[in-house]
């Protein structure tokens, strides 16, 4: 450049030549300043391409003809790519990263990744000075950022899993030791508290350790004393009501029912609440005298005796004397019946049904008009009320009738046969009391019935016994089992073990 005006500055001119066609391509290697790269210490350097990603871009090699080939496979693959807009990238070695190894195997390793978009809006040139003093400018093609690779060997999947298990063991060990320390601390604190208690003055010494129990027992005794005084006052003011006695009776009868009952005993009673005909209207209940509502379920001998005791209080002393004379005889028999009822729940239910039917027959003979008859529902008598459920008329009848009915029932019980049972249960719906009893003719243990059940699906003996319940058939449990065994021998059904249980089935 020439000097400008009168300025005395010396300017040196350089010639820069830009070659049009060059075989060489220049790239820039960028290192991070934190890596502290010093080229003066490099004795040996090796640079090579990382071609490990070549497998990703390669297509599966399939034979075009012969065994294993597909017709027009390439054409169909191209059509699929066009349909979904898939553009395959070609594997270009110049786009792959560089691997730089310095000073042999023991030296450092660097990986250079190509930085895209560097030469889009800018142009970088490398100037080299020639022997004649002129500079040659070469454009930069690519820019690579080099980062050091980790020297340590990475773990494989199996090694990583082993290390993870070891870590869990170590953490568990630490947690266990921490728990032991906490326990030891708690024990030390407890021992210190005991020592402090033992060091107290002798005036504070107490013989009984359970202070809370003593306080609770004293409170309970005070409360029981107050309750006793209240009950004595209540007895002086008014006589004991029936409701209070009925609650006590319910507790005892509930316990007995739950102890003696078996699976499926009360399955036949599930339909009892479906009909509304047996439920009396509120107007009728207002007109009637209040009768205690007894619990649902079979009525035992204890309940009959208690209900008779209730009726004693309402009667004049003349009837009390007559009833006492009649009651003296059946007391040992009642004890015997209690033992029988605890042995077999099914037989107890059947005996209760028989007792009710016999009492109903006796009432029909005496022709004692009930206070008010309950209208049974329009359906069958079986669905309206449970067997053994006491009605309002049964509660209001005289005790003499009850005692005579219990005698009659005890006499019949000794010589009880299945045929007599059926006859008595069939005559039950004809009673004047309006009480409904289940008829024995509804379900019968027959060969056709068993065959019908077994052709539907495989069943166990327990399932068959549930189908033929004692309430429906009128037979005892032992008789039902014997009849079923004989029918199964005649039918000779197929036997299969399903879930560790023997199932019987028949084919049509």
Swiss-Prot record:
Gene Ontology cellular-component annotations: cell junction; transcription factor TFIID complex; transcription factor TFIIF complex
Basic residues bias: start-end ranges: 232-251, 364-374
Modified residues (N6-acetyllysine): 407
UniProt xrefs under Gene3D superfamilies: Winged helix-like DNA-binding domain superfamily/Winged helix DNA-binding domain (1.10.10.10)
Keyword terms of this UniProt record: Acetylation, DNA-binding, Nucleus, Phosphoprotein, Transcription, Transcription regulation
Biased composition (Acidic residues): 255-270, 303-325, 343-355
Residue positions, PTM N-acetylalanine: 2
Localization (cell): Nucleus
Family annotation (Pfam families): TFIIF_alpha (PF05793)
Family: Belongs to the TFIIF alpha subunit family.
Protein name: General transcription factor IIF subunit 1
Name of the gene this protein is made from: Gtf2f1
